[in-house]
Amino acid sequence: MQIGSRYGALLLAAVASVIAFASAAQSTSPALVWPNKARAAVSLAYDDALDSQLDIAVPALNRHGLKASFYLTLGSDTVRKRLVAWRRVASAGHELGNHTLFHQCSRSPPDRNWVTPDNDLDTISAAQLVAQIRLGNTLLQAIDGKQERTFAAPCGDLNASGEPYLEPLKGDFIAMKSAFGSVVPDMQTLDAYAVGVEVASDVTGDQLIALVRRAAAAGTMVNITFHGVGGDYLAVSRKAHEELLRYLASHRDIYWTDTFLRIMQYVKAQRVKDQPVSLRQTLQ
């Protein structure tokens, strides 16, 4: 009995030491260093596969040499009718991300009357939605030939028929945009599967630039999500969009603007690299 108690005490002490060591390492871990010593990472995302993104946003991004992420609603008419154009977007170095097949959202919150009954997230099971999202990855691979992917949750809704659906999908994606929020407060504690986004709609170029400046001041990252650009819905003006791109392109020493996929691949790699060797071995 005494031997068992002594062994249990030693085991508890060992576990406590590992936890304390991990906490100390985390609290003293250095700020994440961005490529080329940039002060912030900027992820520009465009949701819902809209015509204005192909007609206005993509040419503007290419003109400024900036890479972005396009989260396709794969059942949309724009994907079906302009598939070749989306393939060119991927060939230009932009990311095609998964935004589900049909953009299901919960119809129950206020101001959600635009959600049709057949696309009501409250009436589809989590298992059905997971299967659809995985099919979406297969369709995306048929478009761009890539296997690594990120996901953006429509409307930021995390439940289907009241059941969480993201957990089974974590192995299918490098990272997920599934929360709201602008500038990331701490890269070391960021949950790669609950990254927050700032949805930009009816804002000025100055307001968009102020967002990325806040990220530079924090030394972290900002995720700006657009829908329409100079048209469609939840739109920003072509002028505001152009002003942001021009600012980012002229301050490449400060901002690393890239796809969400590449940014999060880098973040994950740096986190592992920054861990003390002894801690990495202990946690393996």
Label for each model-derived stretch:
Residues A20-A22:
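N-terminal signal peptide c-region/cleavage motif recognized by signal peptidases
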Residues T28-N36, A68, T78, Q141, ...:
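C-terminal domain-boundary segment and adjacent tail
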Residues A40-V42, N62-S161, G171-D172, A179-V195, ...:
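Metal-dependent polysaccharide deacetylase catalytic core of the NodB/CE4 family, i.e.
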